[in-house]
Swiss-Prot record:
Keywords: Aminopeptidase, Cell membrane, Hydrolase, Membrane, Protease, Transmembrane, Transmembrane helix. The keyword Hydrolase applies. Signal peptide: none annotated. GO terms for molecular function: aminopeptidase activity. This is Uncharacterized aminopeptidase ML1167. Aminopeptidase. It holds the Pfam family Peptidase_S58. PANTHER family: BLR5678 PROTEIN, D-AMINOPEPTIDASE. GO terms for biological process: proteolysis. Belongs to the peptidase S58 family. Its main location: membrane. The chain crosses the membrane at residues 32-52, 75-95, 106-126, 148-168, 176-196, 287-307, 329-349.
Amino acid sequence: MILMAAPMNSITDISGIQVGHYHRLDPDASLGAGWACGVTVVLTPPGTVGAVDCRGGVPGTRETDLLDPANSVRFVDAVLLAGGSAYGLAAADGVMRWLEEHERGVVMLGGVVPIVPGAVIFDLSVGDFHCRPTAEFGYLACQAAYDAAVGGQDATVAVGTVGAGVGARAGVLKGGVGTASITLESGPTVGAVVVVNSVGDVVDRATGLPWMTDLIDEFALRPPSPEQIAGFAQLKSPLSALNTTIGVVATDATLSPAACQRVAMAAQDGLARTIRPAHTALDGDTVFALATGAVEATATADVPVAMSPETGLITEVGAAADDCLARAVLVAVLAAESVAGIPTYCGMFPGAFGTTIGGGNR
């Protein structure tokens, strides 16, 4: 299987997929005061198949049962990723209102019912506990995605401290939003967008570098100085009652709901490869998978007749989704800017970018 970088290295490399952010962030937000939360919405083209895989011990989700391949509804109109813990699920009401206004959803007598699964992160300790997303956040994130698409704006997804990633933490460091994409030799493109808010670290405390050595080379990172590594090792982990990394992987391949679910399951390995530990009892790690069906592709691998004809394609797309999600995690952490005094990777390890100045907040 040959993987090639897609043009924007973004989930929006998949035609019809649109991403919008909305957040409120006070410049003086602190741990316990001010606004520091937001949402990220993924809009899909009509006829997009959806599935989900949930591995964390404390998930906060919406409409995930509906995505079980055994159930009747196949298509998804949008996916909500939100801060605010369970309160943030209120943002889905705004997403549904926006979709209804644009006549998207299951057509029923008298109107439409939009299908909007979603998941949330626990970020209530960053900023004021009572400052959390509302329905208006979801509506405005949808509008931002739509405006970027129809207005001819740059379709590249904003990363770092934006949208649902504003209050996110990755272990002891600032987390955020990341995205990545890959095009397969067989034709389909696979992309991911992730909100990194993990209990586990994305950095090896012994080296100051990512766990995945492949990513060290890809992002041209260098070993930080011993002083910077020592400073990082002294940071105490803010082990909280709830964390969670949530994301969406998408492809333009044609997949059934069951195949889509297998892709979501495979993509979870991208979290395990870049975050240690992952899928803990304190996380609610949830990954949605979307297949727009714009590209008809057949995997090159032969499979026994007794197996599903999708097996080879599922394997290829799943492996690519795993890689995309892993890369997106590191993009999120490298792009993050400090909020409420939470240190960033760039601030703690300037030596990883060839700079020898001391660490701190970015």
